[in-house]
């Protein structure tokens, strides 16, 4: 199964509370922090809400 490397490239400060919560739930703290998550519907849904804050790479 593929995995996604998610990197926070813009700050979550001054964003909607829902967006800040998603960033925290993904395990992203500071700008340029990265996490690897499974490529499933739940993760894709979270990324959809904060796509303007993160970069996503597919890892095989």
From Swiss-Prot:
CDD domains (alphabetical): Ribosomal_L30
GO cellular component: large ribosomal subunit
Keyword Ribonucleoprotein: yes
GO molecular function: structural constituent of ribosome
Domain of life per record: Bacteria
InterPro entries: Ribo_uL30_ferredoxin-like_sf, Ribosomal_uL30_bac-type, Ribosomal_uL30_ferredoxin-like
GO biological process: translation
Entry's family note: Belongs to the universal ribosomal protein uL30 family.
NCBIfam families linked: rpmD_bact
Protein name: Large ribosomal subunit protein uL30
Phylogenetic placement of the source organism: Bacteria, Bacillati, Bacillota, Bacilli, Lactobacillales
């Amino acid at each position: 199964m593929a995995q996604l490397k998610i990197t926070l490239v813009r700050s979550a400060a001054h964003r909607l509370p829902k967006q800040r919560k998603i960033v925290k739930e993904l395990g992203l703290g500071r700008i340029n922090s990265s996490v690897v998550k499974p490529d499933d519907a739940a993760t894709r849904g979270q990324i959809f809400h904060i796509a303007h804050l993160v970069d996503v790479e597919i890892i095989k």
